[in-house]
Amino acid sequence: MRFLAVGLLRSVCLMAVVALGASASVAPAAADMMALDGAWSGGGSVKFPSGAKEAARCRANFKKRGAESYQVSARCASASGKVEQSALLTYVGGNQFTGSFFNEEYKVDGTITVTVSGNAQSVSISTPAGSSATFKLTR
């Protein structure tokens, strides 16, 4: 059970980081002005399918992949352990990005949504197994 919880936590944490980083653009035309490239960090919480919650911290690196997309790699940690994940985010309008994430170690994937407000990002992550996470990242 703990092994599964750690895998889900890791996937959710990475997804949150990715989502937070992707939402920094307000519009494709403004992408250069609000570039997500570089390092972001912050914290939030992870909810497991069992209903248990844990605080978590994440560090994410964003690399522009196209006019409206970013590749993200993230490391997150909680009381359950540490995890590394990757994600691809696409601009969807306004100040939001959405995409998918994947944790290679635990073979966990899911969706991520990032909303940008100034120098902060709000990230929301979910997995088909019922895990979720929310994070706030800053530069």
Regions found by a protein language model. Name each.
Residues A30-R139:
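Central antiparallel beta-sheet cores of small beta-barrel/beta-sandwich binding domains
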